[in-house]
Amino acid sequence: MLHASAAALGGRAYLFSGPCGRGKSTHTHLWQQTFGEAVQVFNDDKPALRRLDGRWYAYGTPWCGKDGINLNQKWPLGGICFLEKSQENRIRRLPAAEALPLILAQTTYRLPPQYMELLLASLDSLLREIPVFLLENRPEEAAARLSFETMRRAAEEEGL
């Protein structure tokens, strides 16, 4: 599971992650405002990630945070985006070495030592196959458009 808010649009899931207070729920609400009913927010705190038949999927879980958004849905994963507040909207793709510590910090990883190797192997696969971004943003519709268009384009280029 990843500490994130998960939204589906255009047949793919996109996850917004970061520490508490970074605007994960705010950003998925902006997606709803910007793209309307085409967006499905299916988990607002801890979606599950799983690789199945050569493809990564995001799942809604009962662990859904204060807003209670926890739909029992599965979507192909199109991208993960870490959020930072900023005065300008900018997005960039993160190399795996930069993305790994961010993902580890937001992963439910209180595991016995013998399972850490499995977690790290899964994260290695995830980072090789799924584009990860950093979005510096203001809470506005322009940031929602920037994040979606950038991640959608990357997902299409990667064949996701």
What are these regions (language model features)?
Residues 22-23:
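Conserved glycine(s) of the Walker
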